[in-house]
């Protein structure tokens, strides 16, 4: 099957959406499908305001239309609500062909945190974007329910996975040269240093040991100045990041707006338990068993979650991560695709 994947988030960007799409493409190609990714690197771009490292396509509609005409795909999936997403949406509507979309990021929460834009405005815009979609893929049941309550339709559950080979299990936290001889326990945060990540909830925790942060973002300079005792590592290659996960005693997800939170799965695959708030992504990833989280701890008080997660055996974190696989996620994705005009081919071209 020929699939056109249109996305504003792609390499060399570093974020969970890019990771998800790269893994998806790899799995689809391994099944024999032909995937054509249309991304900002194929167009003239401009930096995204306030988000260094993210470039957005400009004046792309004509070229994008030509690409899709030339590809003649069996299915079109629009992964993001950026400029390329809107252009692909317009193309499909004009051609009267069906397409699917995905909801990866709570942009209304980001705009609200950074610029105080009312949440209702942001969700009205996204509801309009996804309205003509034949299937809106969402990563968790919590997000699905939230979008349903906000008037989104044609919602489809699409979970994610983790590379269990890359993020290898370690029974005990390892020693990593980037971390030196740090006071234990080592608490790790991985993510963009931006408003919506709520990172200061992590940095302000009164905990023993050392805090380590991997990531860059618009708040980076001010945070480094205000929290000099934190070990700041910047962005790391994924193979290096896997080793840092393995060296941590626990992982802290301070964000309250994660739709999924792949970084949690990556940490847990290495055996590092997670402390997080009981919100959409963490509730899905950590799950609940008799009221207790699996592979970590959830609590409205992040400090309480931190202490509880520290007591979680590393093998329990690994076991929970194994529930999620990219193979399963890819099967779900294929089930949710819709043909542009007629019946989809059953297998690869």
Predicted regions and their residues:
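Conserved donor-binding/catalytic core segment of Leloir-type glycosyltransferases
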Residues: 175-212
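Aromatic "clamp/platform" in nucleotide-sugar-dependent glycosyltransferases that forms part
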Residues: 256
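A charged, aromatic-enriched C-terminal amphipathic alpha-helix characteristic of glycosyltransferases
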Residues: 311-345
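Short hydrophobic beta-strand element within catalytic cores of glycosyltransferases
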Residues: 273-276
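Nucleotide-activated donor-binding/catalytic signature segment of Leloir-type glycosyltransferases, i.e.
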Residues: 221-239
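Donor nucleotide-sugar binding/catalytic pocket of nucleotide-sugar-dependent glycosyltransferases
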Residues: 124-172
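Short alpha-helical donor nucleotide-sugar binding micro-motif in glycosyltransferases
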Residues: 68, 130, 243-248, 333
């Amino acid at each position: 099957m020929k699939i056109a994947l249109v996305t504003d988030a792609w390499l060399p960007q570093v974020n969970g959406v890019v990771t998800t799409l790269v893994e998806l493409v790899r799995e689809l190609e391994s099944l024999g499908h032909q995937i054509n990714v249309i991304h900002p690197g194929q167009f003239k771009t401009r930096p995204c305001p306030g988000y260094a490292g993210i470039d957005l396509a400009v004046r792309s509609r004509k070229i994008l239309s030509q690409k899709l005409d030339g590809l003649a795909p069996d299915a079109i999936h629009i992964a993001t609500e950026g400029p390329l997403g809107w252009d692909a949406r317009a193309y499909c509507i004009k051609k009267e062909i069906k397409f699917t979309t995905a909801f990866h990021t709570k942009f209304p929460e980001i705009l609200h945190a950074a610029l105080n834009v009312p949440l209702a405005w942001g969700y009205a815009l996204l509801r309009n974007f996804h309205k003509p979609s034949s299937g809106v893929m969402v990563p968790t049941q919590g997000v699905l329910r939230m979008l349903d309550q906000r008037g989104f339709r044609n919602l489809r559950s699409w979970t994610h996975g983790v590379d269990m080979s890359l993020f290898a299990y370690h029974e005990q936290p390892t020693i990593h040269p980037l971390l030196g001889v740090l006071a234990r326990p080592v608490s790790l945060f991985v993510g963009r240093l931006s408003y919506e990540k709520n990172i200061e909830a992590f940095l302000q925790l009164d905990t023993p040991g050392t805090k380590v942060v991997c990531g860059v973002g618009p708040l980076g300079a001010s945070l480094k100045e205000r929290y000099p005792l934190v070990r700041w590592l910047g962005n790391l290659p994924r193979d290096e990041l896997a080793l840092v996960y393995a060296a941590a005693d626990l992982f802290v997800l301070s964000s309250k707006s994660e739709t999924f939170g792949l970084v949690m799965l990556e940490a847990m695959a290495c055996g590092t338990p997670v402390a997080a708030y009981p919100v959409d992504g963490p509730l899905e990833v950590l799950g609940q068993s008799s009221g207790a989280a699996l592979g970590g701890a959830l609590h409205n008080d992040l400090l309480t979650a931190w202490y509880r997660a520290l007591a979680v055996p590393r093998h329990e974190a690994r076991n929970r991560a194994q529930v999620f696989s990219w193979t399963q996620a890819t099967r779900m994705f294929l089930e949710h695709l819709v043909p542009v005009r007629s019946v989809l081919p059953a297998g690869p071209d």
